[in-house]
Amino acid sequence: VASGLDEYGGFLPPDIAEQDLIDVISAERQKAIEDHLKSSRTALSEMEVRIRFGKAAIEIIRDVMAFDHDLVMKTAVGGSGLAARLFGSTALKLIRKCPCPVWIAHPEAPVTPRRVLAAIDPMPATDRSDNLNRQILETASQMAQMGGGRLDVLHGWHLPGESRLTFGRTKISPDKLERMRAMAEKVHRQKTNDLLERMQSTISSANLHVVQGKPTETVLSFAEREKSDLIVIGTADQSALAGMLLGSTAESVVEKSRTSVLAIKPQGFTSPIKPR
């Protein structure tokens, strides 16, 4: 996706039409990409190169809609500076608005992942969350099998409102707090086991980890400690606005992860981007 002609500002002479410039840029980009693909050992026999002008995320999403793509892959190299922090990179915009799964590939990650981490959340146990967890587990299991590697299934849990219980006049005793934590862990562990039992046909073998901590922190720390090659995670925090996935765990993981991330959309997700 080319950014367009904004960078040329008012430098176009009257005898040069914008379309002429677009044609020149398109031909140059097309040749550069095709030359790169020819020299690549991984180039496919059937491959189509398309050049688009406009905002990268929007044009990518419109191509997904037009050609019914099942997956978008993008490198984890994006913009920097204040603008990127305020408005989000192309990767984050794809996570929020793209209708199909999005794979953000870390430059140093292996092409075929051998250590795959599936981040699930069994609570609340609804049909919607079950379907999303099933998609996560199916995808992660397939990726691990392709590489002949290992599948880790992780659920991070925490006691809601714990900080309110430990400070101020109404704080409870350490003993009571510890018992509440123990009960919370028991419930989360049971719900996670129940989920995996319901989905036995989905995964062949996996290493289960139920870890105390907030979702983003547990996923990132586990992936770094265990040297995961790929994190498979769901984007479930949909706002009242159609297609807007704001503040989700997946988004936070993509922003901070040093590992490739594959973000799975929930069933019924509708992108706010209009097709061409």
Which ranges hold each PLM region?
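Short beta-strand elements of ligand-binding domains
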Residues: 73-76, 102-107, 261-265
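Small/aliphatic-rich secondary-structure junction motif
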Residues: 1-17, 115-174, 205, 256, ...
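A short acidic, glycine-rich active-site loop
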Residues: 17-31, 125, 174-190
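Structural beta-alpha unit
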Residues: 3, 19-23, 27, 31, ...
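Glycine-rich, Arg-bearing micro-motifs that act as flexible, cationic patches
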Residues: 74-93, 230-255, 270
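Short, structured interface segments
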Residues: 89-110
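General small-molecule cofactor/ligand-binding pocket signal
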Residues: 48-52, 103, 152-154, 193, ...
